[in-house]
């Protein structure tokens, strides 16, 4: 260590927030990257500030230690107190929230929530959505059955009744969805029938409608359009089997013929608890 470094004054930064303080912390770290030669930096966090006495104690400590105060406080009274104290005691004070809130409110004529931790709430919603998508991908098309009881809903139906698109649409809204294709020759595992309280939705459509979709799908894949997959009699047999499964699972039946994914999802959501 050279003499310059040893004599370098410690830069002290206080992060004060009525939530976790991650917004100010990110801003400070982003700013400090502009000072790569600055090594003696001390950052202290004071999260979840709820009363003015506690806030004043922190401001007094900042005054004594010659610290810069960076805040993300939603409370107008806290912000007013902080600005006043900093002005009276010559404390370097950065308010990351109130100025921008005021400007956006003025420009848009919209009322802010004035809610602490709104970003964290948004992040929580994001991670819940990711978790739901990961679950729904894992349990798509009958790939897994082990934790199927964790699903918010189970969707069953024959091929080309929109099971996967509907599952992914609902997953993006925070719902964990499992879906199982119904094929007469392949039995559904017993543990699926034993699930208690699992909401089940059976997707169906007319034989001719499904046949047309399957024919188009086969042609897209470069397969023969005249195959067992899109044979009308075969599809009728699959639908009879599907009806039997719907009854066993006490499924709510949805006819997806000429329905958009949004329409079917809207109907299913009426039976589910709101997620996000």
From Swiss-Prot:
InterPro entries for the chain: Kinase-pyrophosphorylase, PPDK_reg
The EC code for this enzyme is 2.7.11.32, 2.7.4.27
Catalysed reactions, as listed in the record: N(tele)-phospho-L-histidyl/L-threonyl-[pyruvate, phosphate dikinase] + ADP = N(tele)-phospho-L-histidyl/O-phospho-L-threonyl-[pyruvate, phosphate dikinase] + AMP + H(+); N(tele)-phospho-L-histidyl/O-phospho-L-threonyl-[pyruvate, phosphate dikinase] + phosphate + H(+) = N(tele)-phospho-L-histidyl/L-threonyl-[pyruvate, phosphate dikinase] + diphosphate
Q: Which residues make up the binding site for ADP?
A: 157-164
Gene Ontology molecular functions: ADP binding; ATP binding; phosphotransferase activity, phosphate group as acceptor; protein serine/threonine kinase activity
EC top class named in words: transferase
Membrane spanning residue stretches: none
Task: Name the family.
Answer: Belongs to the pyruvate, phosphate/water dikinase regulatory protein family. PDRP subfamily.
What's this protein's function? Bifunctional serine/threonine kinase and phosphorylase involved in the regulation of the pyruvate, phosphate dikinase (PPDK) by catalyzing its phosphorylation/dephosphorylation.
Name under which the protein is recorded:
Putative pyruvate, phosphate dikinase regulatory protein 1
Q: What does UniProt list as this organism's lineage?
A: Bacteria, Bacillati, Bacillota, Bacilli, Bacillales
């Amino acid at each position: 260590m050279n003499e310059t470094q040893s004599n370098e004054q410690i830069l002290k930064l206080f992060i004060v927030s009525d939530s976790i303080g991650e917004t100010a912390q990110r801003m400070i770290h982003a700013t400090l990257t502009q000072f790569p030669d600055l090594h003696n930096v001390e950052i202290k966090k004071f999260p979840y500030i709820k009363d003015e006495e506690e806030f004043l104690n922190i401001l007094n400590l900042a005054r004594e230690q010659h610290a810069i105060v960076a805040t993300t406080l939603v409370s107008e009274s806290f912000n007013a107190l902080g600005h006043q104290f900093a002005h009276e005691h010559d404390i370097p004070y950065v308010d990351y929230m109130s100025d921008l809130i005021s400007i956006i409110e003025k420009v848009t004529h919209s009322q802010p929530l004035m809610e602490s931790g709104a970003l964290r709430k948004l992040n929580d919603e994001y991670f819940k959505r990711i978790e739901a998508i990961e679950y729904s991908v894992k349990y798509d098309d009958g790939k897994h059955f082990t934790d199927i009881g964790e699903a918010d809903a189970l969707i069953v139906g024959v091929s080309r009744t929109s099971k996967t698109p509907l599952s992914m649409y609902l997953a993006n809204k925070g719902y964990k969805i499992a879906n199982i294709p119904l094929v007469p020759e392949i039995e559904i595992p017993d543990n699926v029938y034993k699930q208690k309280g699992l909401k089940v939705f059976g997707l169906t459509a007319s034989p001719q409608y499904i046949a047309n979709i399957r024919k188009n799908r086969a042609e897209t894949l470069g397969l023969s359009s005249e195959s067992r997959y899109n044979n009308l009699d075969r599809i009728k047999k699959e639908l009879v089997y599907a009806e039997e499964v719907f009854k066993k699972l006490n499924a709510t039946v949805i006819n997806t013929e000429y329905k958009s994914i949004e329409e079917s999802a809207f109907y299913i959501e009426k039976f589910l608890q709101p997620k996000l």
